[in-house]
């Protein structure tokens, strides 16, 4: 649930070459993000507290499509489903038989999932961006320019031009690490993947 809400609200062994935040870093990150109009992958997510103690570990699958469409399904036993049709987000909790529906916040600092599925053409207006590169791996660190966010730092890592993992760090040092596997880019995804059908008998909360 924590990962879902952060997405909503939102050490390499090689010697890395640091790159100062400049227009080249911004342009490179924007290009890498925008070249994938669709993405599908499995993910594994690990949450650690500020001292490094494991708090939660989950797995699941995701599908993304620009602009602003995503389907993020966490496996049982902590099953959750988050679906965006580009205008609203539906969060389904099968254990509670409850769906929460809210308007999609288009701000990248409030909805990190949009970094992979939304409009990132003005990403530098929301974040200070720095990059480090080693071989075929590029790490981008994004720090929000405003304090009204659910995370203090976000790292996106690309391997051979494809998203490999991401990490979010909140104000108390809690880390959420997400590793993507079996990533497929720019393949057709059924439109129904981004339409949530409310189950019969479910409690519905509109926010």
UniProtKB/Swiss-Prot annotation:
Location(s) in or outside the cell: Periplasm
Annotated keywords: Chaperone, Periplasm, Protein transport, Signal, Transport
Signal peptide positions on this chain: 1-23
Cellular component terms per the entry's GO annotation: outer membrane-bounded periplasmic space
CDD domains: LolA
Main location as per UniProt: periplasm
GO biological process: lipoprotein localization to outer membrane; lipoprotein transport
SUPFAM superfamilies in the record: Prokaryotic lipoproteins and lipoprotein localization factors (SSF89392)
Superkingdom assignment: Bacteria
Subunit structure of this chain's protein: Monomer.
HAMAP family registered for this protein in UniProt: LolA
Family named by the database record: Belongs to the LolA family.
Purpose: Participates in the translocation of lipoproteins from the inner membrane to the outer membrane. Only forms a complex with a lipoprotein if the residue after the N-terminal Cys is not an aspartate (The Asp acts as a targeting signal to indicate that the lipoprotein should stay in the inner membrane).
Protein's name according to its UniProt entry: Outer-membrane lipoprotein carrier protein
Source organism: Pseudomonas syringae pv. syringae (strain B728a)
Gene name for this UniProt entry: lolA
């Amino acid at each position: 649930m924590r990962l879902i809400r952060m997405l909503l609200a939102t050490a390499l062994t090689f010697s890395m070459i640091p790159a100062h935040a400049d227009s080249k870093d911004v342009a490179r990150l924007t290009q890498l993000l925008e070249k994938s109009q669709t993405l599908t992958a499995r993910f594994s997510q690990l949450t650690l507290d500020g001292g490094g103690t494991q708090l939660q570990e989950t797995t699941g699958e995701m599908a993304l499509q620009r602009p602003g469409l995503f389907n993020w399904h966490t496996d049982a036993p902590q099953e959750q489903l988050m679906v965006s049709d580009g205008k609203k987000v539906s969060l389904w909790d099968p254990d509670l038989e409850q769906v929460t529906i809210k308007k999609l916040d288009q701000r990248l600092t409030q909805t990190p999932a949009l970094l992979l599925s939304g409009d990132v053409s003005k990403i530098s207006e929301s974040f200070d961006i720095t990059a480090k590169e080693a071989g075929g791996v590029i790490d981008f660190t994004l720090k929000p320019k405003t304090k009204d966010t659910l995370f203090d730092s976000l790292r996106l890592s690309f391997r051979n031009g494809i998203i490999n993992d991401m990490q979010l760090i909140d104000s108390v040092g809690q880390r959420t690490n997400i590793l993507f596997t079996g990533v497929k880019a720019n393949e057709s995804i059924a439109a129904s993947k981004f339409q949530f059908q409310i189950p019969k008998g479910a409690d519905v909360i509109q926010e």
